[in-house]
Amino acid sequence: MTKRHVSLPPEAEEGVDAFITEVDQRLSSDEDVCGVVQDVLVDLFGDREAYERWQSGKPVSAATRVRLQGYDPCNATIESEYYAEKDETAFKKSKYLQWLWRQFDATPMADNVEFALRFRQMLAEHLFERVGDNCRFFKGISFTYGHNITVGDNTVIHDDVHLDDRGKLTIGDRVSLSDSAHLYSHDHDIVDQTAVENYHTIVDDDARVTYDAMVTAGSRVGKNSVVGAKAIVRGDVPDHHIAVGSPAKSVKVKPGWEDVAEPLEAGGENRKEERRIEYELPADLEVFDEFGRDFTPPSPSTSSSRTNSQ
């Protein structure tokens, strides 16, 4: 997409640069990450006066107290915190950084594109396994952890994209993920939903995953390929292919790449098992089943009696 250069007024640019540099330096230091996140959020939400009043022991309302406590990610839980197989060491830091990302997106500053893109790029450099240069991360992006995500150079991830890195996500150079796209790297057993299987999901260089499309766990979207709007990818999209529908099927090769692309029939190959990520849960880990379902199938006699009674 052809863009024009836009810049902030010099005074605004100076303020943005100073703030991002300060947060970056603090996150790169030996300072406690949880404390840094809390401190930054207190100021971003303009709550410094109320926070200092509370910290000094002066009375505050119950609503004010719970709001001020919420700036500290140690006082909050997020969904992925409950996942049994997560890497506890990696998650401890990524939770704090993910909290800062999410809460930043709830501030008015998140709509200042020049400021917000640079702030999120800086956060990604601390949160992701690896992130390239000149990426553009827009508002409302969500992750499972963040620390299992690799993103290449000049990649654009638009509003409300979900990046499930419960397994592993690799997103290449110059990739475009359109609004509301979903990339998954985990799946559930069809009978026992609590049994989780993790995979490596790949979106290769120059690929485009368009509006509201879904790439399921263990799939690969090939180089220079396009996934159509609302498509569901349940296998591999070969390089240079255009895939649409549910499940997504290759319907065309991008003009100009016909001589180097695989035939359309090659699309949809399921190589999920090659990308499985094995894990083991600690034997002493206390777990629970949130559904409490009974997985015992009915006996033949029970099924027969039900049929006869209808």
Question: Model segments located where?
Answer:
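Terminal amphipathic alpha-helical/low-complexity segments used for targeting or macromolecular assembly
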Residues: 1-126, 251, 256-310
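Structural signal for interior beta-strand "rungs" in well-ordered beta-sheet cores
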Residues: 130-251
